[in-house]
């Protein structure tokens, strides 16, 4: 029996995670879920986004399923829950899969998750604020190995997106990435981040495995969601040496919280990635979601009228219709990403 920590978070987080748990339970009985509080509501009660005793219990889990968190501009001393978890658990690799189920294609982005401009380090006084863009050898080497192995296992190339023509930190990062790729005989295409955004919009399907720094990767993956139909269907995994956290990449969307119209697909696919990481099989969920999306009856963010409950029930119905081994060839590599990444970590 696998132990999975559940942090539903704020806004629509509880709604989409409840949906994901229902779907997981429809395909396996080998997971026990343990719920922990976290997010802005916890900060308002305890002064921290997650309590230390809860964090210690979470470290003992096999994986984490995370919803969404609100990070307001105007709450003094509040630190983002997800950034706190990434730092505390050293979740250094962020894998984002942007699927287009109608085309049966995907964009895969590997984002360095612990350093760069999101390192949370800097200095300020009343006249100046500085955020440090930190790239360390350790951080660059481990994310490069992660992305290069993923590219090699999928028999594709690596697209390294940077700003090395301007930033010294990216020159350092670039050298390490190229050295590791050369040793593993993986081809690297280099792209300057500015011009790459145009390629990502116009011709996204021949980019191999995309690797970039923390902030660049965050922005690029959000931009890429235009090819998915909605940010609400995009899953992600945050991988460390000892544990991994899975979350939809969308925010807490407080404007629609409680209305029953949040898109649960990103959370459901994140749970599928979690199953693969645990050595179970998330492929049936990918297949069922693909069939459901192609049939239609989607939530308002995808120009539909369906509720969260209707989408969840529809996906579970598709699961029950599927033969366990009925998997589209085009998705075979993708649905086993978690296993590949488990070997890396």
Curated annotation (Swiss-Prot):
Matching Pfam families: Iso_dh (PF00180)
Cofactor field: Mn(2+); Mg(2+)
Coiled-coil positions are none
Question: EC annotation?
Answer: 1.1.1.286
Q: Give the residues the record marks as binding Mg(2+).
A: 194, 218, 222
GO biological process: one example: tricarboxylic acid cycle
Q: What pathway does the annotation place this protein in?
A: Amino-acid biosynthesis; L-lysine biosynthesis via AAA pathway; L-alpha-aminoadipate from 2-oxoglutarate: step 4/5
What catalytic activity does the UniProt entry give for this protein? D-threo-isocitrate + NAD(+) = 2-oxoglutarate + CO2 + NADH; (2R,3S)-homoisocitrate + NAD(+) = 2-oxoadipate + CO2 + NADH
InterPro entries on file: ICDH/HICDH, IsoCit/isopropylmalate_DH_CS, IsoPropMal-DH-like_dom, LEU3_arc
- Domain of life here? Archaea
Q: Name the UniProt key words of this record, in alphabetical order.
A: Magnesium, Manganese, Metal-binding, NAD, Oxidoreductase
Q: Where does (2R,3S)-homoisocitrate bind?
A: 86, 96, 111, 118, 163, 165
Is Aminoacyl-tRNA synthetase among this UniProt entry's keywords?
A: no
Residues the entry annotates as binding NADH:
69-71, 165, 251-255, 263
NCBIfam families recorded:
iso_homocit_dh, LEU3_arch
What the record says about family reads:
Belongs to the isocitrate and isopropylmalate dehydrogenases family.
What does this protein do, in the record's words? Catalyzes the NAD(+)-dependent oxidative decarboxylation of homoisocitrate to 2-oxoadipate (alpha-ketoadipate), and of isocitrate to 2-oxoglutarate, at near equal efficiency. May thus play a dual role in glutamate and lysine biosynthesis in vivo. Preferentially uses NAD over NADP.
Listed name of the protein: Isocitrate/homoisocitrate dehydrogenase
């Amino acid at each position: 029996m696998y132990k999975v920590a559940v942090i539903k978070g704020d806004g629509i987080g509880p709604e989409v995670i409840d949906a994901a748990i229902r779907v997981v339970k429809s395909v396996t009985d080998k997971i026990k879920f343990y719920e922990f509080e976290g997010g802005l509501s916890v900060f308002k009660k305890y002064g921290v986004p997650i309590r230390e005793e809860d964090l210690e219990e979470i470290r003992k889990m096999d994986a984490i399923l995370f919803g969404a968190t609100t990070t307001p501009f105007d709450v003094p001393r509040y630190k983002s829950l997800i950034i706190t978890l990434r730092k505390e658990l050293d979740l250094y690799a962020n894998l984002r899969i942007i699927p287009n189920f109608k085309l049966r294609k995907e964009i895969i982005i590997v984002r360095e998750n612990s350093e760069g401009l999101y390192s949370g380090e800097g200095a300020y006084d009343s006249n100046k604020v500085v955020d440090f863009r930190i790239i360390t050898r350790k951080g660059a080497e481990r994310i490069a190995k992660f992305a290069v192995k993923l590219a090699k296992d999928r028999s594709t190339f690596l697209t390294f997106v940077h700003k090395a023509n301007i930033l010294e930190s990216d020159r350092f990062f670039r050298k390490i990435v190229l050295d590791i790729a050369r040793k593993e005989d993986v081809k690297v295409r280099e792209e300057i981040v500015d011009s790459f955004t145009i390629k990502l919009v116009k011709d996204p399907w021949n980019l191999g495995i995309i690797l970039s720094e923390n902030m660049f990767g965050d922005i690029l993956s959000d931009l890429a969601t235009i090819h998915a139909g909605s940010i609400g269907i995009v899953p992600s995994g945050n991988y460390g040496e000892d544990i991994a956290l899975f979350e939809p990449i969308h925010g807490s969307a407080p404007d629609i919280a409680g209305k029953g119209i949040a898109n649960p697909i990103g959370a459901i696919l994140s749970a599928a990635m979690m199953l693969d990481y645990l050595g179970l099989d998330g492929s049936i969920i990918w297949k069922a979601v693909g069939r459901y999306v192609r049939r239609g009856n989607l939530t308002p963010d995808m120009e539909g009228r369906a509720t969260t409950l209707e989408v969840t029930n529809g996906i579970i119905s598709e699961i029950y219709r599927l033969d366990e081994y009925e998997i589209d060839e085009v998705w075979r590599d993708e649905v086993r990403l978690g296993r590949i990444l488990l070997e890396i970590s």
